[in-house]
């Protein structure tokens, strides 16, 4: 047995000696032909190979395969396991080399580094002679980030722009499309859902508010987590939350559960905008970033068009429904809610095929993962361009030194929920600290000014875009009221009413021994009238009231004439039998008004297409600030035309005009937000600003709609002032065109 171990050890030592001799001779031959080479990125020269000292030719006896034989003499050999025998620290193979990945620590000697400036002996993110991590200053950390930014930009240029970016463009576009759909879903289903769920005006207002509240929470939550856990992972989770609760909301029956599902659906989709733009920007080189981020904004418009088209095609089809008794009803509007979850589901499926952002990997010290993703980008684009032979030549990428990590505790420490609690608290503390750093000395001014721009833009845009349809409905109501027919002092005896009465007022009438059977009443009012010995059967009504009327010996059978419809009326010896079941409230239902909501939203969303195209083509030519300020000024000017909107067609045209000129400012604001913050704060800052945007939207909608039917001057003044303030603040921000991504 001992003889076998001795032979084995001798064989290993001989093989190692041969390998080292071959390595040294190869190095000498290469050095003779090419003594020194120069890095094309860093312009830095270094030796291709260097002699190595091999002091440890064989493992210590204490590393023995058999734990009890560690005291044997080295020459006897029984001191190595299958995992460690033949181990030489100088000849140790870097783990990633099994997959062809160069080591993060290999940039000091003999390897090519991608960089835009010379780096002195960078190894693993630390410069030569640098002190321990605890003594590192903010200036040194800033220097590292600047070096990484230049280096990363050079790598993206080598990877080129091609098939990989376009594939990711459509994948992330689906996620952005899901956000555009979410904004319109509740507004489209309310005319139909209000009867099924018996929604009062306050219930409808809360349902519209809860979506923005959920998106506000989601933007802040997922934006902060994406800087710590990764863009792709957080986007997958947020879209999954959105799709699951959107699916549930199409089946739940009660108002409370529907409200809860739409809240969590909004929380899920709230992460899409901050993560999508940050994620995509980290795969784009500087010369492509502004244009392609603007093209990406088109998917939000596509989401709005998709929602309007689906509402128009699905909701009016009452045959697309079924009922299980009187407790469970599934009408066509629920099919529409289900269909609106499709973009989110498709985005999840497509996103699983995409890699994590390599910039996130580098910011978190994951060199190997970043190198593999960038190699995938390079190889995909080169194959698509017909150059599969081109090799990804970058062998070292700078990584940022990590000063804080998630707290790890042993698996045998406490219970599983205690361990998860510790990790969650640690993660929450890091997210909160990262958020507070956006208000640190370096970024305080930028953050405060961006808050002002985001708030004013959102306040005016969302306020006006909701005010427009409300004004259109008000104009429709005014026109409808102008066509009301009035019947004063009529006397009707022994007549059977079995048809439809609409938009009528009957004053001072007398109805004696009349029958109202199968009657449909829509916007009908009876005032100061007498009903004696009358019979009402199977009567349905909406917006119908009896004011100051008297009913004598009258029977109501199977009607929906509930108590609140009799205003200051007297019922003498009158009987109500078997009232209709269902919602006792007046609802508008689906009809011409609902169709108008779909049509106006469809046109208003489609009208932003020209603005999207213009902003994409000019974003990198005129700059982000000029685009933002110019579009805001044009939007401000367009607000003054609102005073001329005295008809439906005029208001629709003004809505399209405002949407078309304001979209360019939104595109510029998205690009500017991405480029103003560094990679470790990008989604956190974007998420916070987007959450502020939703808060401003709620305020704008509440304030603007309160003036409907009262005055148009106040909304015009508020919107113009907000846009003017936003454009003036935007001009004080730094221009980011031509800058590398921090």
UniProtKB/Swiss-Prot annotation:
Biological process, per Gene Ontology: chemical synaptic transmission; neurotransmitter transport
Description of post-translational modifications: Phosphorylation by CK1 of the N-terminal cytoplasmic domain regulates interaction with SYT1.
Chain positions covered by the region annotation Disordered: 40-144
Sequence ranges of Basic and acidic residues compositional bias: 40-49
Residues found modified as Phosphotyrosine: 480
Residue ranges annotated as Extracellular topological domain: 191-205, 255-262, 316-334, 469-598, 648-651, 709-712
Residues carrying Phosphothreonine: 84
Cited Gene3D superfamilies: E3 ubiquitin-protein ligase SopA (2.160.20.80), MFS general substrate transporter like domains (1.20.1250.20)
Residue ranges, Cytoplasmic side: 1-169, 227-233, 284-294, 356-447, 620-626, 673-685, 732-742
Record-linked SUPFAM superfamilies: MFS general substrate transporter (SSF103473), Pentapeptide repeat-like (SSF141571)
Biased composition (Gly residues): 122-137
Membrane topology, from the record: Multi-pass membrane protein
Cell location: Presynapse; Cytoplasmic vesicle, Secretory vesicle, Synaptic vesicle membrane
PANTHER family recorded: SYNAPTIC VESICLE GLYCOPROTEIN 2, SYNAPTIC VESICLE GLYCOPROTEIN 2A
Physiological role: Plays a role in the control of regulated secretion in neural and endocrine cells, enhancing selectively low-frequency neurotransmission. Positively regulates vesicle fusion by maintaining the readily releasable pool of secretory vesicles.
Family under the similarity heading: Belongs to the major facilitator superfamily.
Protein name: Synaptic vesicle glycoprotein 2A
Organism lineage string: Eukaryota, Metazoa, Chordata, Craniata, Vertebrata
